């Protein structure tokens, strides 16, 4: 009997131990994270100290770009020794062909790692560096025509600028910045630049930026220290910034890489992300293969195709709790175990997850993680000449292509933008972007350097590609098409020739700021698939349509899923297209829209370049349309502020929506309508202002405004909607009118540089004893027509006054000649008067008055 009780008690104790075992939450004590913690929290920003840009080198044989680096304030043992310099052309230049001179001045010797995109090979480039510094080139072809020389540069910005001008005649750009790991410079000359480079303190330009990552304090714990083939990481973010308007969505980047460079890690990851604020998690993985599942209550996005080395899926769960204990319990209850780490950050906008490699299990992991049909694609030795270079610019060992392999459709739509229109750059070798989902510039390798020429007229666009450039890039047996795969290339002895009508083969039009049309299409280089393509990645049923390169509308047997197409975007511009039938966005002839920003409500001088606005400061906006038809009008359909330059990505910070003001600070002004005495010059203006609220955790924002045509008549032959005033639009605008407005819209984008109050107080703090600088005078003036009217009236008044005086004087002289004896004034007064008149008047009547 006793033995039965002992057995029962022993079984009860065993069951208690078994149930208590998997609860590791009690074993995890939060502590400040160290460098060994797998997850690090950071705050990312972009800035420069001062600088300038000019078009002064346009007529010279080379561009001249000056970088003047300042110490970042580290101790002697923490000096940064390496800088990565990213070079690519400005947005208006597709491939940069001009010679360039770089003056790279640094306070101590540096190793400059050069990363280039869309810079033509065979062009002379000279790098002048400080004594002891060296330049390392990522491309052997680029280094063949590049030279490096050491120089003893002068100190100080102005001295260095004058030295460069004396040596080379002019300077294209001058940038002063603190030493950063990544510096992004766009080469090229833009005619909108000023003629001379004058250094300014508040120099803000997307062409010249440095990236700074500041570590942020975080707490966490590691619950499983041994590397596993499957890991679960929990990240909890309290707030993405300290801004009181943090209800607006902010991008939070999760960067996943191996803990050591030159290694490729195979993992199955589960990330549980939690933030009470409205954020968008942007997931990017490099050099890590396997599957990745993201679970979060917020929106989730993935990086570009080159930033997704893993098979990514996402799951939106609204029941994810907060705090460490609840999160760990929720993960275990939902079967996500074993939990590897938990991290909590009070403030951050970027997280780095670094993974260890369990080398002893790596061989088996590949078998279980990747379907057998695709294993051959991960073997670098089995690949043809078309390979994707390593993401890290060539120093990595991962010669194989990242998994999974995107198809043509996904790559095109991912890199073109949500509207299907290509961004004004080459997606294969992207330019620097600080925009939607890509708030920071990102390096992308694997560019295709081909020689092409584009011609277009009012009916078609023709692009010719040299065959030799394909062979030089290692391509053979490829299929060359436009975006529409039915539009195949024709071959002659030397070129591939592709022809597209302006409204076919995937060609998309977009109106440029110069009232012309830019037509976009892409060359798709498709290499035949390797082996069988019947297999699908594990867990494909969980993928959303279009996620990670598997579009929902493609058949399983499509061989393009298992080849890596290269996409080369090209465009062709037509100025003042006269055939409105080929492009229906501008059916009303000679119409010009414009938008300008001003600093005051006088609307005198528009702001040039990036508009600087302080927190809670006023922004004054003027939009106008110049047209020939007086019955045509326009309306401000939508205005919003966004961290994205792409106007098709909407934002919660709306100023005007469907003509109706949504922000309580919007104030409209009543400018006079301008009528010019020449045809096609009738201008309507609309002016408004609003108070800028700091709702985003970034210093660079974009004001997006959509203008739409309307008619002042009851009915318009081209079915334009009737113009509606803002107060009426807030109550009586129906869906049919909104749809009609969307068919004739023009979008303008203006960059805004946010000036934070904290930065202003820090700058003003040390100079309290100095007298306040005299603020620049504000000249209150009138518009041109009013001034012309006043001048004309003054001229008429002056002419009438002169005639009246002449009449009085001439008649007074004749009377004096007829009078023989003066009666009233004495003789002394008459002689004085006659002398005065004779001395001041030189007219023919002067002699008669004294006769």
Curated annotation (Swiss-Prot):
Cystine crosslinks: 52-197, 639-705, 660-730, 710-723
Protein name stated in the entry: Transforming growth factor beta receptor type 3
Membrane-crossing residue ranges in chain numbering: 788-809
Interaction with TGF-beta ligand: annotated segments: 737-751
GO biological process: animal organ regeneration; BMP signaling pathway; cardiac epithelial to mesenchymal transition; cardiac muscle cell proliferation; cell migration; definitive erythrocyte differentiation; definitive hemopoiesis; epicardium-derived cardiac fibroblast cell development
Region Disordered: start-end pairs: 816-851
Topology within the bilayer: Single-pass type I membrane protein
Bias (Polar residues): 817-834
Subcellular location field: Cell membrane; Secreted; Secreted, Extracellular space, Extracellular matrix
Domain of life: Eukaryota
Pfam families hit by this protein: Zona_pellucida, ZP-N
Topological domain ranges for the Extracellular compartment: 21-787
Predominant localisation class: membrane
Example GO molecular function: transforming growth factor beta binding
Glycosylated residue positions: 141, 492, 534, 545, 571, 590, 697
Posttranslational mods: Extensively modified by glycosaminoglycan groups (GAG).
